[in-house]
Amino acid sequence: GKSEEPNCACDQFRCGNGKCIPEAWKCNNMDECGDSSDEEICAKEANPPTATAFQPCAYNQFQCLSRFTKVYTCLAESLKCDGNIDCLDLGDEIDCDVPTCGQWLKYFYGTFNSPNYPDFYPPGSNCTWLIDTGDHRKVILCFTDFKLDGTGYGDYVKIYDGLEENPHKLLRVLTAFDSHAPLTVVSSSGQIRVHFCADKVNAARGFNATYQVDGFCLPWEIPCGGNWGCYTEQQRCDGYWHCPNGRDEINCTMCQKEEFPCSRNGVCYPRSDRCNYQNHCPNGSDEKNCFFCQPGNFHCKNNRCVFESWVCDSQDDCGDGSDEENCPVIVPTRVITAAVIGSLICGLLLVIALGCTCKLYSLRMFERRSFETQLSRVEAELLRREAPPSYGQLIAQGLIPPVEDFPVCSPNQASVLENLRLAVRSQLGFTSVRLPMAGRSSNIWNRIFNFARSRHSGSLALVSADGDEVVPSQSTSREPERNHTHRSLFSVESDDTDTENERRDTAGASGGVAAPLPQKVPPTTAVEATVGACASSSTQSARGGHADNGRDVTSVEPPSVSPARHQLTSALSRMTQGLRWVRFTLGRSSSVSQNQSPLRQLDNGVSGREDDDDVEMLIPVSDGSSDFDVNDCSRPLLDLASDQGQGLRQPYSATNPGVRPSNRDGPCERCGIVHTAQIPDTCLEVTLKNETSDDEALLLC
């Protein structure tokens, strides 16, 4: 296969592909042209010759199985290694000598081309060109003509940035699909490596390339000005911008000033219509080779311009996909809409499922209630029954007999305690003392008034509101006297006491007054006997002391004590013993944890703990005008001096340390006079002598 010839000799035949063959080869059932054009014009009716009729080939021919006729034929030696496959077994293109190609180029500019250009390059060509300009500036490589074999990917041209064949510095790969001109490749340095490789099947015209250092022009080119490149005389006023500034297309004869021709046919356009993505030229030359774009347009990598609104719209408008590169990931609106609708549907299904579940549950419960049995109703009635009253309430109401060691406090007893507290507060004027009792504050009053426990039975002796609860054998004629005695002792001007007295006479919860319960009367203990003896001796000592001092003291002779008064005195005596026991218990318990007792802290104005559950404790002291014997209760119930000695008595008087001031509010219970600073209370000194005996009697309990 030679290159195309304008004309063939008179004794030759011109093939359809431009190839010339001898006239004798025409219509010989062999494809010498390569495109079967020498056999298509023949109108032979006879069958092609068989292999048995094949004649030997001449010396300047070779035997080959034709690719077109599928029969053996004789081909000329000139068809071997011509780049065209004539034999079916590729025998005419095998073991061909490859011409030497490639060159080392060291100038600022130059040209190179493929082997046999503009003829077909030999099959299997393998050439390498090394361009080293010796300058650090870029090298511009331009392919003015490029045509490779289009039968496959076998023929290619690889361009590297530098002289080494480094895959990481590969600038571009050109194949038969890039068969258009011009093609421009720019390196980052002054060195480029160009490698051309062709397969052994078929061939093409090849390529022609030029190179130059950036800023220099070839001898036959005209500079565009500055670093805008160069153009040739043939490119002048051809309607195609070869210079970015359009210098090769300006001031053309067929256009006015500042206008550019669309082509050589005389149509022109202004600069403002250049590269605005609107074709003003019939051939669209005003939108080709755009180095810059008008405002509002996007410049593509292939030197085209598109609208900026078309960038990142999921459509390739540039043609090379450059308008869709580096776009942010945006979820489409239809995807969001589908997600919202799906969520609503799922929520609706969930609501329906919950509604069905509740409905099934209600139906199930209704069905279960419809099959309710008698036993289930009985169980429900048992579960809904009211809780029975407590054991203490039954004992207080008199429905059941009391049990030993079971603490019982009836409403009448509670009223007695309240009367005691109110009477001491209103008549005697003692300040209430708040004792922080921590965990024992809830039952301190029960311990005070239930202290006198029977040694034999172990039950507590309760303070009764009525005298007949203690001694049921007393006659009814003494009832007014007892009531009078109580009124004189507890003369409290409050409605609560009257209401409480009236309530004791009213009917109980069961429709009447509760029947009196049998109470165990404890025998006279050693403590009571000792307290009585101490009281009588204290009275005699007090009288003797007054006589020695020579003071005019009016003695009050106590009247004879009736049995009712004796009972009340016994009750108050037991209450006094209970208060003393509390004092003793508090002093003993506090001595383990701290050196100073809670009573000493109270006397010094220091409280042990700021607890919310404090007990308000009153210190009752009977008045001297009482009409019964109070000798047993002459000492203060919480006498701090008996436990702490004389050291605790000093804070009571700042002027006279040796005399203990009387904190009484009224006449003395022993002598009947009002003690002041001029009239010292000598009764207290007599009381101090009996403190030791009282403490010993208290320890017997």
Curated annotation (Swiss-Prot):
Q: Which domain of life is it from?
A: Eukaryota
Q: Does the keyword Transmembrane helix apply?
A: yes
Topologically, how does it sit relative to the membrane?
Single-pass type I membrane protein
GO CC aspect terms? clathrin-coated pit; plasma membrane
Q: Where is the LDL-receptor class A domain?
A: 7-43, 56-97, 216-253, 254-291, 292-328
Q: Where in the cell is it found?
A: Membrane; Membrane, Coated pit
**Record-linked CDD domains:** CUB, LDLa
Tell me the disulfide pairings in this chain: C8-C20, C15-C33, C27-C42, C57-C74, C64-C87, C81-C96, C101-C127, C217-C230, C224-C243, C237-C252, C255-C268, C262-C281, C275-C290, C293-C305, C300-C318, C312-C327
Q: Which residues lie on this side of the membrane: Cytoplasmic?
A: 356-701
> Hey, which stretches end up on the Extracellular side?
1-334
Glycan-carrying positions: N126, N208, N251, N283
Q: Which InterPro entries match?
A: CUB_dom, LDL_receptor-like_sf, LDLR, LDLR_class-A_CS, LDrepeatLR_classA_rpt, Sperma_CUB_dom_sf
Listed A to Z, the keywords are: Coated pit, Disulfide bond, Endocytosis, Glycoprotein, Membrane, Receptor, Repeat, Transmembrane, Transmembrane helix
Principal subcellular localisation of the protein: membrane
Provide a GO biological process annotation: endocytosis
CUB domain: residues covered:
101-214
Composition-biased stretches, type Polar residues, lie in 590-599, 643-656
Residue intervals passing through the bilayer = 335-355
- Extract the Pfam families matched here: CUB, Ldl_recept_a
Annotated region (Disordered) at 465-520, 535-565, 590-612, 643-665
The subunit structure is: May interact with RACK1, ZFYVE9 and NMRK2.
Q: Give the similarity note.
A: Belongs to the LDLR family.
- Function comment: Probable receptor, which may be involved in the internalization of lipophilic molecules and/or signal transduction. May act as a tumor suppressor.
Q: What protein is this chain from?
A: Low-density lipoprotein receptor-related protein 12
